[in-house]
């Protein structure tokens, strides 16, 4: 149990730090659509897709690795709450089209990235 707690905790800390770094580097480039938040979610979507596919093909791998990568690292990297706050900010400012566009971009890009992650593992492990 302690190893699982460590896996999630360390993964979560590392993922959160990477998300923070992306925000620092990218959000100022285009404040109307914070690119750090978008990059965090898309990268996490890709890696989660690849990880789910990889762990599904390799059930012998210790479950702590799954907890570290999927629950911890990608849980810390992806940021639905920040995305939601950004959308609500657009809504409060009366920018309905921006809010709808941000929703469409985040959801579409993240789902496509997840499918690409799954596809990558399928192609590489043939």
From Swiss-Prot:
According to UniProt, the reaction catalysed is: fluoride(in) = fluoride(out)
Residues of the signal peptide: none
Q: Where does Na(+) bind?
A: 75, 78
* One term under GO cellular component: plasma membrane
Q: How is its activity regulated?
A: Na(+) is not transported, but it plays an essential structural role and its presence is essential for fluoride channel function.
Q: Does the keyword Transmembrane helix apply?
A: yes
Q: Where in the cell is it found?
A: Cell inner membrane
Q: Which keywords accompany this UniProt record? A: Cell inner membrane, Cell membrane, Ion channel, Ion transport, Membrane, Metal-binding, Sodium, Transmembrane, Transmembrane helix, Transport
Q: Name one GO molecular function term.
A: metal ion binding
- Biological process terms in GO annotation: cellular detoxification of fluoride
What membrane topology was assigned to this protein in its record?
Multi-pass membrane protein
Which stretches are transmembrane? 3-23, 35-55, 68-88, 103-123
Entry's PANTHER family?
Answer: FLUORIDE EXPORT PROTEIN 1-RELATED (PTHR28259:SF1)
Q: Which family does it belong to?
A: Belongs to the fluoride channel Fluc/FEX (TC 1.A.43) family.
This chain's function reads: Fluoride-specific ion channel. Important for reducing fluoride concentration in the cell, thus reducing its toxicity.
Question: Which protein is depicted?
Answer: Fluoride-specific ion channel FluC
Gene label: fluC
